[in-house]
């Protein structure tokens, strides 16, 4: 059984959520054509450490960077590299922080310069599907209610939901129970209780739902090489309405798209 967090633990995780949200905003400020993904990683790691925290992803199961940076058809877990961002790309930036013994986790997919109408729709729908999932993250519901909300919204626009990857519980460990799929049926899955802390993270493909693992053993790519978007927030399950621990406000108030 999943142990709900105490209010003291949630307060520490709230600090983490703000830090990871601010980190993504710092990264977003420099996303532009001509910038390498290594530079995005450098900015994030410096900001995290300057604020007294540790990048959670660095060294996690051998992962070599502070950020997962996934461009275009890379769904998640891409490595920062000397790849130069191009006009029309999209770049998913997934950030984790360890602060005062607890983890924070959030992801945002940024457009690089001007993107085409289908790509813009993919970004908008994926982000809204996240909010639909969050609306279902209330005490008494089940993880299937979250997945159903994400899936039905995304698929209504002709997009597809990745099945092999899912959200997760979070706390002292980056990945805790329960798993939080982005598809499912109402009333199925783990029961949500007040005080549970979970990450909801839709990964939505423009084309087919199928994905494959790249040769580096980390990056997950779409099978048809069409674009994929990824948005993630950490929430506390509450009675009536989930509480956000991370937020996109710092990004959307400070970054021009």
Pin down the residues of each PLM region:
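Active-site neighborhoods and metal-handling regions in enzymes and metal-associated proteins
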Residues: 1-257
